[in-house]
Amino acid sequence: MVEIPAIDLRLAGGGGGAEETARLRDACARLGCFRVSGHGVPPGLQAEMKAAVRALFDLPDDAKRRNADIIPGSGYVPPGTANPLYEAFGLCDAAAPADVDAFCARLDAPPHVRETVKAYAERMHSLIVDVAGKVAASLGLHGASFQDWPCQFRMNRYNYTQDSVGSPGVQVHTDSGFLTVLQEDECVGGLEVLDPAAGEFVPVDPLPGSFVVNVGDVGQAWSNGRLHNVKHRVQCVAAVPRVSIAMFLLAPKDDTVSAPGELVDGEHPRRYREFKYDDYRRLRLSTGERAGEALARLAA
């Protein structure tokens, strides 16, 4: 069974880390999923954020529903027909402190929770921008900047019971954006990624202190097919609640997704037409093609 590659960010992407950079490039191209260490996010902040998220989910339902927005993927998402065990909180732009303040205010979150969420969102935004830059550098694009790309922040809880063991928590899907950085539940596994070579799902077991990175659909399109958008799912493996925290780097600020010219040549002709990310997200919703199939509709 394939192992999830582990990348030390202190080595990857720099001039002296050619071997680690090559491993990063291979992980993105082959599996579309890897772990990162050397990320600089303090263990104490990770623990504080996990406690804050659990406190938010333990709020009464009426308080949680006050944080419901009309923007898809933002606000409170209650359990539904497709994923009855799953609920989430979303922040549409985690890079904007005002959005974080508004999110906490609608929940009447206490000051220490607000400060934890703000500090964590800031560190995670820096981390995902750094990871994206190193991924781009592994493809030879050393000047690419992702600082102003919108980011979505999502807190997830899976309300597992004994009856749900063995059932799906979230169905098979790809992420629609460029990259996802995920802090897993340190006690409960369940995340599985598809190994395209073997056609089998591989468990991503918890590893405290590390983050899991997934390549999404925009990552595959922007890289002209060099990066692999990983299919993944969440399975219930234990009758206990499972909490995870995700940061999504979505698409360029102007919403336009197009492979840079440096990644298009005679041997690598352009694979996808230029498209708007919001249009693509709506395409996924309207077609129900949420596991990367919708990209084929944008073939050049």
Curated annotation (Swiss-Prot):
Disruption phenotype: Male sterility and production of parthenocarpic seeds. Increased levels of free IAA in anthers and ovaries. Fe cation binds at H173, D175, H232. Residues 149-252 form the Fe2OG dioxygenase domain. Its EC number is 1.14.11.-. Gene3D superfamilies: B-lactam Antibiotic, Isopenicillin N Synthase, Chain. It comes from the Eukaryota. Belongs to the iron/ascorbate-dependent oxidoreductase family. PANTHER family: 2-OXOGLUTARATE (2OG) AND FE(II)-DEPENDENT OXYGENASE SUPERFAMILY PROTEIN-RELATED. It comes from Oryza sativa subsp. japonica. Its cofactor is Fe(2+). This is 2-oxoglutarate-dependent dioxygenase DAO. 2-oxoglutarate binds at R242. Keywords: Dioxygenase, Iron, Metal-binding, Oxidoreductase. 2-oxoglutarate-dependent dioxygenase essential for auxin catabolism and maintenance of auxin homeostasis in reproductive organs. Catalyzes the irreversible oxidation of indole-3-acetic acid (IAA) to the biologically inactive 2-oxoindole-3-acetic acid (OxIAA). GO terms for molecular function: 2-oxoglutarate-dependent dioxygenase activity; metal ion binding.
